């Protein structure tokens, strides 16, 4: 009965143009915070889950110790925000700073992933808003990221932020072995 009342409420709110993205189906204690070293195992779980979704499981080859050292060692090269739901890491936004000779400092979002159980409940939006705050704090002029062209849910999510597509660019990478 609670779910039916909730759904009826959502439909009525949508009729009046009220943003329902931040309403939750059940009470949750969600905290968006900077990642700490102890989060790395759960973060790697989310990264593997994302790779599975993107049909690229075999591409996750990073050694766990290297991953931890790269984020929390003396010369850290990445940082992350996590979404903690009732004390468990259920979302991740991993980023690093890069430099554009045309634009200056840019925050590059490597991965934004929320456990599928919690998608559509406003957690991704809260993480994106927190990431925008980090970019402003670090004096970055923009945030860049990539999305697979078939990942329509992600594209739809990002388009809510009035984003620009970098049409005409081809991505390259070179394996160093």
Please identify what each model-predicted range represents.
Residues 31-43:
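A short beta-loop-alpha structural element at the N-terminal edge
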Residues 44-70:
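Conserved GNAT-fold acetyl-CoA-binding loop/helix
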Residues 70-82:
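A short helix-loop-beta-strand connector motif used in the catalytic cores of GNAT acetyltransferases and
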Residues 82, 88-96:
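Conserved beta-strand in the GNAT
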Residues 120-133, 160:
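Conserved acetyl-CoA-binding loop-helix of GNAT-fold acetyltransferases
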């Amino acid at each position: 009965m609670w779910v039916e009342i909730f759904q009826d409420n959502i439909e009525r709110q949508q009729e009046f143009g009220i943003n329902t993205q931040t309403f939750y189906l059940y009470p949750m204690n969600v905290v968006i915070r900077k990642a700490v070293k102890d989060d790395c195992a759960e973060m790697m779980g989310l990264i593997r889950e994302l790779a599975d979704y993107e049909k690229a499981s075999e591409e996750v080859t990073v050694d766990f110790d290297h991953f931890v050292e790269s984020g929390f060692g003396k010369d850290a090269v990445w940082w992350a925000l996590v979404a903690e739901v009732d004390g468990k890491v259920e979302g991740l936004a991993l980023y690093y700073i890069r430099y554009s000779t045309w634009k200056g400092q840019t925050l590059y979002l490597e991965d934004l992933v929320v456990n599928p159980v919690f998608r559509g409940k406003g957690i991704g939006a809260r993480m994106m808003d927190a990431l925008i705050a980090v970019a402003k704090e670090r004096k970055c002029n923009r945030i860049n990221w990539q999305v697979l062209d078939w990942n329509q849910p992600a594209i739809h999510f990002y388009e809510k932020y009035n984003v620009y597509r970098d049409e005409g660019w081809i991505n390259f990478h070179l394996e160093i072995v």
